[in-house]
Swiss-Prot record:
It holds the Pfam family Med8. Disulfide bonds: none annotated. It comes from the Eukaryota. This is Mediator of RNA polymerase II transcription subunit 8. The lineage of its organism: Eukaryota, Fungi, Dikarya, Ascomycota, Pezizomycotina. InterPro entries: Mediatior_Med8_fun/met. Residues 139-154, 206-222 have a biased composition (Acidic residues). The gene is med-8. One of its GO terms (molecular function) is transcription coregulator activity. PANTHER family: MEDIATOR OF RNA POLYMERASE II TRANSCRIPTION SUBUNIT 8 (PTHR13074:SF9).
Length: 278
């Protein structure tokens, strides 16, 4: 095999990156072998803390390798492995075949197929991922002047899927906060009929909700009148920290009546105790 950076026609910095990646792969292989030996020899199996620590080390190694591969993708795609005339092909044939292999090994191929099956079962189309990755890499030379710095970074084919999942999650959370959080009955209870739900209460939950809404409206009017009596206050000052905190936690600004507004509580005159009867 051709040795050194001269045979590969690499710059010193490029050869250094290649050496760093080789060392990272060596560390990853060592960590995998160490974990495999620990599991094989330990009776009983290693503790949960030990397995978690090993998994964290492996994940960190994989992230580092992925980052190096992304940062030097052009370099690694340009490098071509070719045997030199003095390579011991007879005694090191297995290494030569491993380096020159263009297809995945059967075991690795089975892992890839399993991953594709899991992705398909989850609603992800592997062919769509591959096509999106191909489209992201197919840039014309004229497009380079119009690309942002973020577009120059290596693209992830799962970005669109993660964005879709994030949007669905946010929509579900928003629907729950706005429509379901204050709902006294579940969807299943609504479907079977709320008259068949045993709440253990003498009054209907629907009636209680309507009464609470009326009380909230009355209290809001009282608060607005109390606030108006304190001077000329614009509409922006009618929002208190309690409203903001409630909006952040529940998705609406309907503060319950049992929550006192600190600003109004401080401004209102405390009610004194009645004088004792003579």
């Amino acid at each position: 095999m051709a040795d050194g950076k001269d045979s590969l026609r690499l710059a010193p910095d490029e050869f250094k990156q290649l050496e760093v990646l080789r060392n990272r792969f060596h560390q990853l292989t060592h960590s995998l072998n160490s974990l495999f030996n620990d599991i094989q020899r330990s009776q009983p199996l290693p503790s949960q803390e030990s397995l978690t620590a090993s998994a964290a080390i492996l994940q960190k190694s994989l992230e580092t390798i992925q980052k190096l591969a992304d940062e030097n993708s052009d370099l690694f795609q340009r490098i071509v492995v070719h045997p030199s005339t003095n390579f011991p092909g007879r005694t090191q044939e297995h290494i030569l075949l491993q380096l020159l292999r263009k297809k995945l090994e059967p075991e690795v191929e089975s892992w890839v197929e399993d991953a594709r099956s899991v992705a398909k079962a989850s609603g992800l189309d592997p062919s769509k991922l591959a096509s999106s990755q191909q489209r992201s890499n197919d840039y014309d030379d004229d497009d380079d002047d119009y690309r942002d710095e973020e577009e120059d970074a290596p693209s992830d084919p799962f970005n669109e899927q993660w964005a879709d999942m994030f949007q669905v999650s946010m929509d579900s959370i928003r629907d729950y906060l706005m429509n379901q959080a204050n709902e006294p009955y579940t969807i299943a209870e609504r479907e079977m009929g709320i008259e068949n739900v045993r709440t253990g209460l003498k009054r209907s939950l629907e009636e209680e909700d309507s009464e609470e809404e009326d009380e909230d409206e009355d209290e809001d009017e009282d608060r607005s009148l109390a606030t108006a009596g304190l001077g000329n206050i614009n509409a922006a000052n009618l929002f208190h920290p309690e409203h903001v905190l409630w909006l952040a936690s529940r998705g609406n600004m309907k503060v319950p009546k049992n929550v006192d507004l600190e600003a109004i509580r401080k401004r209102e005159k405390p009610r004194g105790r009645p004088a004792p009867a003579q």
